[in-house]
Amino acid sequence: MLTWLNRNSLDFPPLEKALREPNGLLAAGGDLSADRLISAYRHGCFPWFQDGQPILWWSPDPRTVLFPEELHISRSLAKVLRQSRYRVTFDQDFASVIKACAAPRSYANETWITGSMQAAYVELHRRGHAHSVEVWDQDELVGGLYGLAMGQLFFGESMFSRADNASKVGFATLVEHLTAWGFVLIDCQMPTQHLHSFGARSIPRQTFADYLSRHLDQPTDADWSARRV
């Protein structure tokens, strides 16, 4: 039975209560306050819903993750990186990145990054939890991604690309820095061919939960100050 959240409590049900079909649906309701979102990620779930639906919270089993040391760079992407065609920055234009991620894709008319979701993550960015990667072609924003950093874990949310390989360059650059900063895992949530091409793989939900308990409160050398990287 699906759990409906109490607006007066930030608690989530145990992950093992998530439905098998649809895979990982854990709870519904609540709100998108910054405190609830932080509680959700620390618990191992994330919001994902369409306009007109209640807020839905998910914790799929298995969980798709990327271990930074397992990053795979294809020969074609390595060539693009060597060419330094694009300029990559962190936290210089979070609002534009999430707005671009929210734009409907060619294969879908709707977006799950609703206006309320955008506002919620902009607030998380203001609080220092959510971060953006911007990819520039001269002064034009042509790609990027955003997510949350908590302890030694990075929770990827969405990416976009308006030029060849732009989002790939941003993601590869991010992983390079996360590795140097001491991050141990990148949460990719759900499997995609794009993520698997980078070396992402699926692990049991309980294994993911174990990583949360061990690494959420561990320090890193992260420096997200808005700058070119």
Curated annotation (Swiss-Prot):
One annotated GO molecular function is: leucyl-tRNA--protein transferase activity
Q: What is its main location?
A: cytoplasm
Task: Give the Enzyme Commission number.
Answer: 2.3.2.6
One Gene Ontology BP term is: protein catabolic process
* Keyword Transferase recorded: yes
Which locations, inside or outside the cell, does it occupy?
A: Cytoplasm
- Write down the InterPro entries for this protein, in alphabetical order: Acyl_CoA_acyltransferase, Leu/Phe-tRNA_Trfase, Leu/Phe-tRNA_Trfase_C, Leu/Phe-tRNA_Trfase_N
Catalysis: reaction(s):
N-terminal L-lysyl-[protein] + L-leucyl-tRNA(Leu) = N-terminal L-leucyl-L-lysyl-[protein] + tRNA(Leu) + H(+); N-terminal L-arginyl-[protein] + L-leucyl-tRNA(Leu) = N-terminal L-leucyl-L-arginyl-[protein] + tRNA(Leu) + H(+); L-phenylalanyl-tRNA(Phe) + an N-terminal L-alpha-aminoacyl-[protein] = an N-terminal L-phenylalanyl-L-alpha-aminoacyl-[protein] + tRNA(Phe)
Keywords in alphabetical order? Acyltransferase, Cytoplasm, Transferase
The record's Gene Ontology cellular component field reads: cytoplasm
Top enzyme class, one word, equals: transferase
**Its domain of life?**
Bacteria
Sum up the protein's function in the record's words.
Functions in the N-end rule pathway of protein degradation where it conjugates Leu, Phe and, less efficiently, Met from aminoacyl-tRNAs to the N-termini of proteins containing an N-terminal arginine or lysine.
**What family is reported?**
Belongs to the L/F-transferase family.
NCBIfam families xrefs: aat
Q: What is this protein called?
A: Leucyl/phenylalanyl-tRNA--protein transferase
